[in-house]
């Protein structure tokens, strides 16, 4: 793996996830979170002459990592449009779909992108820099109740109402544009011993709202269910409870709400069988090499 790709993002659970795709040399595969190309390169190394891989990423920075391989096609798009682009490329069904839902190290470490509270910079957080809504737009324009709901639902923050109130009060004087200005408002609401964890939750909540992550994930999972061949694999790495719940539900019941449908006779109609009944997590060696992998959970299901 080249240096640029390693600095962009270290692939998490690389062997476990690609093994879980059950790759055949002449199969058709999709990596819906191309990023630093770590998983994609491993998939390509297992393909033969008839094999094909599509890699999705909405971030223009990921285009620097495009793989020069005749079996690879890069799709610059949000993975919520999976089905549209499969049709565009004349692909009816695929053999496996991989999604690593973690934010790339590149995003956290680039101060201009605004994903981390470790750096000052614009309060941005857009995965797609061409998209309109930024984190600054949210904190400056959303009503107090809506802000509180975002922090409660997407950050699971107990003091969501206090946060929203403090933000609305502060912005009455002047707009909040930088991470530094934002931290001055919210830091006093957290105790020093839990400050980093709570700030991470605030930034997670804003990032999810900016990028419509839950809506996009729901649409991608539904599209993946339709796109997979019988025997095809859905392989997903999650990093927080909100996305993990959706993935677990669709694999167990066929929808993200977790409500399994039944046929006329009351038999459960579930599209998948679980390949791993217990989630796969990084071992201590991987966590030591890549601390950001600590919260990763890998789930694998096979289409019936």
Curated annotation (Swiss-Prot):
Compartments it resides in: Cytoplasm
Pfam families: Methyltransf_5
GO biological process, one term: rRNA base methylation
Disulfide bonds: none
Highest taxon above the source species: Bacteria
EC number: 2.1.1.199
Keywords: Cytoplasm, Methyltransferase, rRNA processing, S-adenosyl-L-methionine, Transferase
InterPro entries listed in its UniProt record: RsmH, SAM-dep_MeTrfase_MraW_recog, SAM-dependent_MTases_sf
Gene3D superfamilies to which the protein is assigned, alphabetical: Putative methyltransferase TM0872, insert domain, Vaccinia Virus protein VP39
NCBIfam families reported for this sequence: 16S rRNA (cytosine(1402)-N(4))-methyltransferase RsmH
Protein family membership: Belongs to the methyltransferase superfamily. RsmH family.
Name recorded for this polypeptide: Ribosomal RNA small subunit methyltransferase H
Gene: rsmH
